[in-house]
Amino acid sequence: MDPSVLLLLAVLLSLFLLLVRGHAKIHGHLPPGPHPLPLLGNLLQMDRGGLLKCFIQLQEKHGDVFTVHLGPRPVVVLCGTQTIREALVDHAEAFSGRGTIAAAQLVMQDYGIFFASGQRWKTLRRFSLATMKEFGMGKRSVEERIKEEAQCLVEELKKYQGVPLDPTFLFQCITANIICSIVFGERFDYTDDQFLHLLNLMYKIFSLLSSFSGQMFELFSGFLKYFPGVHRQIVKKQQELLDYIAHSVEKHKATLDPSAPRDYIDTYLLRMEKEKSNHNTEFHHQNLMMSVLSLFFAGTETTSATLHYGVLLMLKYPHVTEKVQKEIDQVIGSHRLPTLDDRTKMPYTDAVIHEIQRFSDLVPIGLPHKVIKDTLFRGYLLPKNTEVYPVLSSALHDPQYFEQPDKFNPEHFLDANGALKKCEAFLPFSTGKRICLGESIARNELFIFFTTILQNFSVASPVAPKDIDLTPKESGIGKIPPAHQIYFLAR
């Protein structure tokens, strides 16, 4: 054999051995898991069922804490209620970093409230919480905004008497309008072409991220990013959303009154001006753009999808619908809109909404975290920047807390006296320091929108209840509800 070929093989073998030794040195204290192949990681453990199915199967073999390799990238997976709460609550600071969602971060990188970590994230979260509270509790509270939107929804659905519709984008409209009123200072008509285009972009992004192709990109992003694929579609759609946000920011700048900020963007612009001499400020244009995109996206997709699943579940389980409507009729009647004060008087309806969130399980593998320092967890040393996946589905289907975890049963959230009971396994918004920023708004939206729909309409389908398929279109980072034609019949 040619000496130069032998030399090349020797160099490659040496590099491979160094890589393996380096890998063991860096990751030697991580929890055990399935043996990874070089570069491919645990690809062989995956099938068309995606990451969630893979993680649940591995939990059965390796326990509640194990390591998988997404391609060459090691990730620690946390399963079960107690494990997740121990990490995200008991070790909240250590696990407060944001992990990688490769396709989304090609554009967003580590900017904005969603993908930031460390001091940047703390600063943006503190500002966003205060600002959303200010515009949600001021002259027009979030409740008033939701009730106004609920009334608009009723009027829109009345137009479809006797005609079935897929409510996907209508439910997106109502949830998006709440966050738009806080962030952009305006609501949109349901027929506004630009608004519908923006909603379609977000829906497509969420679908692509959740697709099997999106999950494959997550495994091999370092290599696949150089080739055509799903990630380029996501980047293009993100950029269209950012173009709209940039246009809105410029309009805000042109009409800004420092004495009377109208919304989140105005308040951020004023903070930017205040800190313009601070070279280390986090209040710059990049963080504004990415924070607005994050809020717009998070405030629309999961809540609208939960509401969509809620209606599908009412179609499939009409006996539950009857009990909800009976409680609505007794507590609210038919002549006024539901209010948040009604919730404490309606334990069955509240339990049904909780069970819809649990059963629909819309963010099954949770959003990735990373540890921000070397962390000792359950006897394993997780080096700084280790990525962590808290599998929320494993809590929402935890048999230690739910008697029938794979069945839709509102009794999961009712005690022996019919009162709503709390459950520490109920983690649809995650938990700890990175719990969903908009949890309170989302819970309020779900209660008012859901009760308003069933107060005013009976739901029906051309398909028999037993034949309604709840299998999601996509299941990855999120779940995309299946499309069904639904009749909304005035009561």
UniProtKB/Swiss-Prot annotation:
Signal peptide positions on this chain: none
Question: How is it placed in the membrane, per its record?
Answer: Peripheral membrane protein
Primary localization: endoplasmic reticulum
Locate the Phosphoserine modifications and list their residues.
128
Class of this enzyme: oxidoreductase
* Location of the protein in the cell: Endoplasmic reticulum membrane; Microsome membrane
> Is Chaperone among the key words of this record?
no
What SUPFAM superfamilies does the record tag this protein with? Cytochrome P450
This enzyme catalyses: an organic molecule + reduced [NADPH--hemoprotein reductase] + O2 = an alcohol + oxidized [NADPH--hemoprotein reductase] + H2O + H(+)
Instruction: Please list the GO terms describing molecular function.
Output: heme binding; iron ion binding; oxidoreductase activity, acting on paired donors, with incorporation or reduction of molecular oxygen, reduced flavin or flavoprotein as one donor, and incorporation of one atom of oxygen
Cofactor list? heme
- EC number per UniProt: 1.14.14.1
One Pfam family from the record: p450
Q: Which domain of life is it from?
A: Eukaryota
Which keywords annotate this record?
Endoplasmic reticulum, Heme, Iron, Membrane, Metal-binding, Microsome, Monooxygenase, Oxidoreductase, Phosphoprotein
Residues the record lists as binding heme: 436
Q: Which family does it belong to?
A: Belongs to the cytochrome P450 family.
Functionally, this protein is described as follows:
Cytochromes P450 are a group of heme-thiolate monooxygenases. In liver microsomes, this enzyme is involved in an NADPH-dependent electron transport pathway. It oxidizes a variety of structurally unrelated compounds, including steroids, fatty acids, and xenobiotics.
Q: Provide the protein name.
A: Cytochrome P450 2B9
Source taxonomy lineage? Eukaryota, Metazoa, Chordata, Craniata, Vertebrata
